[in-house]
Curated annotation (Swiss-Prot):
Belongs to the binding-protein-dependent transport system permease family. CysTW subfamily. It comes from the Bacteria. The keyword Cell inner membrane applies. GO terms for biological process: sulfate transmembrane transport; thiosulfate transport. Part of the ABC transporter complex CysAWTP (TC 3.A.1.6.1) involved in sulfate/thiosulfate import. Probably responsible for the translocation of the substrate across the membrane. Residues 44-69, 126-141, 222-247 are periplasmic. This is Sulfate transport system permease protein CysW.
Amino acid sequence: MAEVTQLKRYDARPINWGKWFLIGIGMLVSAFILLVPMIYIFVQAFSKGLMPVLQNLADPDMLHAIWLTVMIALIAVPVNLVFGILLAWLVTRFNFPGRQLLLTLLDIPFAVSPVVAGLVYLLFYGSNGPLGGWLDEHNLQIMFSWPGMVLVTIFVTCPFVVRELVPVMLSQGSQEDEAAILLGASGWQMFRRVTLPNIRWALLYGVVLTNARAIGEFGAVSVVSGSIRGETLSLPLQIELLEQDYNTVGSFTAAALLTLMAIITLFLKSMLQWRLENQEKRAQQEEHHEH
């Protein structure tokens, strides 16, 4: 009888229309801001059928833009992977003067406009910059070439791995690392067998975010590339060029390809985030059982 009374009381609760209204508004706004534009990109790309899409994808300039985008990511991501691990290890395992300043400096790529970052690199490595004369004497071209595009991409993507690793490494502490050293493990053995398994999901999550930013970077890359057709056009820059040439199908084809890359990256990010959250829950449960 008590259960029936409790059920009736539960059923008698008024519906929270305000909550559902806010949920509906949030879903609607998200759909129009995020989902509808992505769908529109694919609709426009295939508006004249499959053949124009295939023809645009087979265009030499398009293929070069795809290759250049992938190459930049393949260089920038590993560099930031190593840099992120070393810097995260430094700020989480050692106390030193300027540690907080170093963590603050890592946020500069988030705070500075990518266009400003590209301009700084252009002025520094350009012909009239501090290193420009030396580079010209040795026939080394950084600006208006792919090395400059790689440099600015490394700059704008450098915080992601570090920012993912630091909280995880701080929460885990250094007890396991110290125990491994006491048991006779070398530095590399300690990292490979103790540290890396504990940070692997956060590390992969940071790599996915770095890759997403690397393949989609436009502002900084556009400043230092010179936008030379068939030479220094990454996929985002190729989209702009095709749009300026009134090649609507071509620009939407490139945009659809870039969007597809972003969707795959987002899917990987979500999977890694899910794994990371589950790992943290299991660790908390194990710690609770121990106590």
